[in-house]
Swiss-Prot record:
Catalytic activity: (4aS,6R)-4a-hydroxy-L-erythro-5,6,7,8-tetrahydrobiopterin = (6R)-L-erythro-6,7-dihydrobiopterin + H2O
Organism: Xylella fastidiosa (strain M12)
Annotated keywords: Lyase
Keyword Cell inner membrane set for record: no
Protein name according to UniProt: Putative pterin-4-alpha-carbinolamine dehydratase
Amino acid sequence: MNDRITLAQAHCQPREKKEHKLGQARLAELLPQVPGWELSNNGHALTRTFQFDNYYRTLAFVNALAFIAHCEDHHPDMNVHYGRAVVCFSTHKIGGISEIDFICAAKTSALYEQGI
């Protein structure tokens, strides 16, 4: 049995020191684990656009994501539109991406896949 947990099963631990900022090699290793996400803001953030049938479903997703973000104490930047939400994770205190951004990206993708 594999005792490793997935990113979506992990929980966020504070990552506020500069040494927690991921380098290019680690980013390249983790990015395939969050399909659909891409580096943005000159490699300082993870971004994905989620599509929905209507505004109600978009807001339901955003509200569910807000609950997850609150529980993990790591909050994305979001742009909400009719039929889509753009979600962007970065660790502002380190000026880039840390492992908690990947954890939250994986949790966000899992939420979307549930059909919320």
